[in-house]
Amino acid sequence: MTYKDKVAAITKQFRQTVENKYNIIEMKLFGSFARGDYSKTSDIDLMVRLSKVDRNIEEDLFNIAYDLELEYDCVIDVIVLPQNFDNDIMIYQNVQKEGIAI
């Protein structure tokens, strides 16, 4: 399995797990994988917008990512945003420019 295939499997599994529990507004892969300049040591950057976000939901998403990190021996960084937020946030603008919907 190539690293690109591995990332595809991880993002698919992450999305399926999250959408079985929560109402996803938007989910994107961004960073080096979205730009195509990744290496085998690159982390996997994911942005998730949900209709509702609280501390417990955020912690659950981090735990889902952690389980995948252990399973696939990788690093996953997750940004969790509520449906209504200030979309002037710089990181969100970057995700919108370079992100790939998953």
Placement of each model-derived feature along the sequence:
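Catalytic core of pol beta-like nucleotidyltransferases
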Residues: 1-25, 35-36, 40, 51-102
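Glycine-rich beta-strand-to-loop/alpha-helix junction loops that act as flexible
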Residues: 30-32
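Short beta-strand->loop micro-motif that forms the acidic, two-metal-ion catalytic signature
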Residues: 45-48
